[in-house]
Amino acid sequence: MASPLNQQSLGLLIKERRKSAALTQDVAAMLCGVTKKTLIRVEKGEDVYISTVFKILDGLGIDIVSAQTSDTETNGWY
């Protein structure tokens, strides 16, 4: 069973996926249609609108359900 995501773990997931795609914050922000400052806030787990988080997930091609399952299985959490 997947553990629930919180703001900080979701931010880390986004940051890890961005880095694994070899994207800078500037480029990722542009692809997602947000400012670099906003992307940084999301990656830090700070408060933002949920619509902004979905915009970033979509822009980076992250499926939150499979990402959460993959992340928890990698860490050995079932």
Curated annotation (Swiss-Prot):
The keyword Chaperone does not apply. GO terms for molecular function: DNA binding. Disruption phenotype: Essential; a single hipB deletion cannot be made, probably due to toxicity of HipA. Induction: Expressed in late-exponential phase; part of the hipBA operon. Keywords: DNA-binding, Repressor, Toxin-antitoxin system, Transcription, Transcription regulation. Residues 25-44 bind DNA. Residues 14-67 form the HTH cro/C1-type domain. Pfam families: HTH_3. Antitoxin component of a type II toxin-antitoxin (TA) system. Neutralizes the toxic effect of cognate toxin HipA; overexpression in wild-type or a hipAB deletion temporarily inhibits cell growth. Binds operator DNA; in the ternary phosphoserine-HipA-HipB-DNA complex the DNA is bent about 125 degrees. Homodimer, binds DNA. Forms a HipA(2)HipB(2)-DNA complex with cognate toxin HipA; has higher affinity for the latter when HipB is prebound to DNA and HipA is phosphorylated. Belongs to the HipB antitoxin family. This is Antitoxin HipB. It comes from Shewanella oneidensis (strain ATCC 700550 / JCM 31522 / CIP 106686 / LMG 19005 / NCIMB 14063 / MR-1). The lineage of its organism: Bacteria, Pseudomonadati, Pseudomonadota, Gammaproteobacteria, Alteromonadales. The gene is hipB.
